[in-house]
Amino acid sequence: MIDVQHIDHSFTIGKKGRENEVPVLKDVSLSVAKGEIACIVGRSGSGKSTLLNLISGYISPTKGRIVINGTDVTGFNEKEWAQFRLDHFGFIFQSFQLIPGLTTYENVEMPLALKGIKPSERKQKVQDMLKRVGLENHAAHYPNELSGGQQQRVSIARALILNPSIILADEPTGSLDSETEHEVLELIQQLNRERGITFVIITHDDEVASIGHSKFQLHDGVLKGGITVEV
């Protein structure tokens, strides 16, 4: 499903002619199987977000190879990556990333519209998804009318609406209290079991990491190895 092979990534800093390469990831390899929840754990600055951005094609590796769903995506251009993300990925963010001027319904509908699906076909899909995440009675609400947990459920519904095979989640409970965090983690586990979706979650929270089938530890850009855990 996801195969990262000997990835290096560096940032260039300094003025032209006096640039310095700052290594962020160093010879990172990991494999995530179909239907797995994989958690990437590490402190701030360890390279977690960089690795997620590499897997999703927002930045390119300095060295190494990335294969996703059997496709070598390492050399993709921006147009190819945009289509690949639309076809294969859903995203969940700590800050929810909802559009303030759109209702719950419209935020969830947006990926369907971007993919060119007819309005007549979109309605039932959105209604079914809102029911699945427990927000069928909040379709007309705007983000500022929802609690943090409800906003994250909208984000999850939006991530799922195109039936992606992979969900990439960046600190998905970082803005939530402990009770709401538990509810969101339960929802992620249910969706994983029901739909066989692969989740890659980056976190520094042990509670979040505890739901993973495997856990990868990043420390100063070095992957310490995958650990299979009982869930």
Curated annotation (Swiss-Prot):
PANTHER family: ABC TRANSPORTER ATP-BINDING PROTEIN YTRE, IMPORT ATP-BINDING PROTEIN
Inducing or repressing factors: Negatively regulated by YtrA.
Gene (UniProt): ytrE
Subcellular location: Cell membrane
Signal peptide: none
Family: Belongs to the ABC transporter superfamily.
GO biological process: transmembrane transport
Pfam families linked: ABC_tran
Protein name: ABC transporter ATP-binding protein YtrE
Presence of the UniProt keyword Hydrolase in the record: no
